[in-house]
């Protein structure tokens, strides 16, 4: 029995600076709203190197010691499994700037959930900030998120 499946690997990181976190106002036509920096993992790179690269490309910041917190995943209509590896980081260097992905800004962490969030970001925020939660599986057919 062949158990192989098509998988898309991506990553996302919540960056903290004291009581603030960095948000990205995503402007991609298919995924808009407030999110965290991140993107696709290239075929030859490690997960950690991917999040460091993506954060740098989208923000100008080089994060250090990112910590993997969990996964947000779902099965697309064509059967492809989509995995988002979730990280947090509080050590970084560099000068903050926006990119083609959208505008970036620091906000109070307590203000995150009142932002115009992109789909799934409430669950992402919970996974990153709750040590008792490590995965959210989204079922497209029912539009239901199962957080564990």
Feature locations, PLM:
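NUDIX/MutT-family hydrolases
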Residues: 88, 97-129, 146-148
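Conserved N-terminal beta-strand and adjoining loop/helix that marks the start
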Residues: 1-21
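Active-site-adjacent beta-strand/loop module that shapes the phosphate/pyrophosphate-binding cleft
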Residues: 74-95, 124-127
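Acidic/histidine-enriched, glycine/proline-rich intrinsically disordered or flexible terminal extensions
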Residues: 130-148
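A short coil-to-beta-strand element that immediately follows conserved catalytic motifs
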Residues: 62-70
